[in-house]
Amino acid sequence: MNALVNLLDLDADALTAYCGELGEKPFRARQLQRWIHHYGASRFDAMSDLAKSLREKLATRAEIRAPAAITDHLSADGTRKWLLDVGQGNAVETVYIPEETRGTLCVSSQAGCAVNCRFCSTGKQGFSRNLSTGEIIGQLWMAEFAMREQLGRGPKDDRVISNVVMMGMGEPLLNYDAVVPAMRLMLDDNAYGLSRRRVTLSTSGVVPMMDRLSKDLPVALAVSLHASNDALRDVLVPLNKKYPLAELMAACRRYLEFAPRDFITFEYCMLDGVNDGVEHARELLKLVADVPCKFNLIPFNPFPESGLKRSNNDQIRRFAQVLMDAGIVTTIRKTRGDDIDAACGQLAGEVKDRTRLVERGKFGKITPLVPVAASGQPREVRPA
């Protein structure tokens, strides 16, 4: 018996092709897509304007299956976090962040992450596998209709989720073939209808795929920078050894030729005594001098294996002031959902690690080299 086709895996073109295989005309695909993504239908017999013959075909050949919630936590500040079962011993986390004028969903793209950034708790679990398109868009599908139920909104009311950030577990550009169709559905007016400015992909700097994305589907781009020079970034973001800062900055400039926004957002995790000195801020000014940008400074959320500490608020403000004095728009991210471990860098989920990262002791005993100052010689810093 053939496996059922999960219709959440199909963007508009793929769904049209699938309906063609069933002997149906393209308008049936549009109807079907609307039932799934506008109304949250998971049963074909509820799709009243589809021909009965099509509903019967779909019932035996297809399904609408999003990842199932294992846990569902609501923070005191309204942040809501789901732990979602994606099978094979893996679970990923998805977070909804309410704000006064928008609702943002933070979406995962992989079970675990192979990039292994020094300050991120996702990386400490290693990497299992890429998520499918259905598992990615299924997070938005599940969260939108769960939030509608929570807030008492009907199918004709405005959507709850107005923004999506691909900033959850995983490196999206290392799962390109599943992430792009999922984002096409986010942008599709017959699905979620988000603008390219309201879908943000965050990358640690996979340069070739940044170039590819700029041609295929240029959404808003955020780059996980976190360091002002290669020596430091090699330690904090190991991918930098493959795509150093000069290549990354050049890729950012190329991306802006196609981007829906006229700036790149640089994310910068503030680590006490590591990357938070005024000298680092000054070096950043030189690094991004010809890249229109804004900075999002992120107070570090500690976890035991990191051996790192959060910069104090005064130091973060001093750092931000250097950037702002140079005319760079700079924000300090407000910590949300930390009472349910939903803040930035805290998403961990459950990962059946194929890389055996934890087993091989890749955390806890690391003593990375970090510069004393931006222009100084590296010294050894042992975990706290």
Swiss-Prot record:
Residue pairs linked by disulfide bridges in the UniProt entry: 106-344
Residue sites binding [4Fe-4S] cluster per the record: 113, 117, 120
PANTHER family: 23S RRNA METHYLTRANSFERASE (PTHR30544), RADICAL SAM CORE DOMAIN-CONTAINING PROTEIN (PTHR30544:SF5)
Reactions this protein catalyses: adenosine(2503) in 23S rRNA + 2 reduced [2Fe-2S]-[ferredoxin] + 2 S-adenosyl-L-methionine = 2-methyladenosine(2503) in 23S rRNA + 5'-deoxyadenosine + L-methionine + 2 oxidized [2Fe-2S]-[ferredoxin] + S-adenosyl-L-homocysteine; adenosine(37) in tRNA + 2 reduced [2Fe-2S]-[ferredoxin] + 2 S-adenosyl-L-methionine = 2-methyladenosine(37) in tRNA + 5'-deoxyadenosine + L-methionine + 2 oxidized [2Fe-2S]-[ferredoxin] + S-adenosyl-L-homocysteine
Recorded family membership: Belongs to the radical SAM superfamily. RlmN family.
Keyword field contains Protein biosynthesis: no
UniProt function note: Specifically methylates position 2 of adenine 2503 in 23S rRNA and position 2 of adenine 37 in tRNAs. m2A2503 modification seems to play a crucial role in the proofreading step occurring at the peptidyl transferase center and thus would serve to optimize ribosomal fidelity.
One Gene Ontology term from the biological process aspect of the record: tRNA methylation
NCBIfam families registered for this protein in UniProt: rRNA_mod_RlmN (TIGR00048)
Listed Pfam families: Radical_SAM, RlmN_N
PROSITE patterns cross-referenced by the UniProt entry: RADICAL_SAM
EC number: 2.1.1.192
One GO cellular component term noted in the UniProt record for this chain: cytoplasm
Gene3D superfamilies hit by this protein: 1.10.150.530, Aldolase class I (3.20.20.70)
Name of the gene this protein is made from: rlmN
Localization: Cytoplasm
Cofactor: [4Fe-4S] cluster
UniProtKB keywords: 4Fe-4S, Cytoplasm, Disulfide bond, Iron, Iron-sulfur, Metal-binding, Methyltransferase, rRNA processing, S-adenosyl-L-methionine, Transferase, tRNA processing
Record-annotated Radical SAM core domain positions: 99-339
Residues annotated to bind S-adenosyl-L-methionine: 170-171, 202, 224-226, 301
Catalytic center residues: 93, 344
Official protein name in the record: Dual-specificity RNA methyltransferase RlmN
Molecular-function annotations in GO: 4 iron, 4 sulfur cluster binding; metal ion binding; rRNA (adenine(2503)-C2-)-methyltransferase activity; rRNA binding; tRNA (adenine(37)-C2)-methyltransferase activity; tRNA binding
